[in-house]
Design a protein with these regions (language model features):
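Active-site glycine/GP-rich loop and adjacent strand/helix microenvironment
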Residues: 1-179
């Protein structure tokens, strides 16, 4: 990570703004970038099939680039989700790619459509990205006798903030075994 190189004195840059994307940006990573570089940090949401789906505004909200994409949060039966409820997945229609159009492409991402206008003044819709559905770990609950869903962001937040470890891999070998 560039922050580590800057802390070690091997990288001397002073960016005004750092744009991130590719993975969910956790608070610990954001805070570290701000501390090391003293710059604004802005996240984006995209996919290999289309960049950018949404950009973070100065107020910390992700605004859907709806001039170029249609984004449809859906439940497990592919029915539209109302604002304020987390989707099972999201369907993407790319309005910009005339060579290889994507129409209602199931991305597998869990998002929540805000339904509220952002205080930054943008008319673009606001979403919260929770992560990829197939990245969610299912672990048994000792108390309730059912499974509990662990989102990658929740695990990353604890490991990054409590242990200061930013590069790691978890492997689930069984219902209750993480390595």
């Amino acid at each position: 990570m560039l922050a580590g190189e800057a802390e070690a004195g091997r990288l001397r840059i002073a960016p005004r703004c750092i744009m991130t994307g590719g993975e969910t940006l956790g608070k610990a990573v954001r805070d570290r970038l701000v501390q090391v570089f003293g710059a604004q940090v802005r996240n984006s949401y995209g996919a290999s099939e289309f960049l950018p789906i949404a950009w973070e505004c100065p107020h910390g909200q992700l605004h859907v680039n709806e001039d170029w994409v249609l984004l449809e949060p859906v439940d497990e039966q592919m029915r539209p989700m109302p604002p304020g409820q987390r989707s099972h997945s999201v369907l993407l229609t790319n309005l910009a790619n005339l060579v290889q159009p994507l129409i209602r492409y199931d991305m597998g991402d869990q998002v929540t459509w805000s339904g509220q206008r952002c205080s930054c003044g943008s008319a673009l819709p606001v979403i919260e990205v929770r992560g990829r559905s197939d990245d969610v770990m299912q672990v048994p609950s000792q108390r309730r006798g059912e499974t509990v869903s662990l989102l990658p962001l929740a695990l990353c937040t604890v490991i990054e903030e409590e242990c200061g470890v930013f590069d790691f891999q978890l492997r689930q070998h069984g219902p209750s075994t993480l390595v």
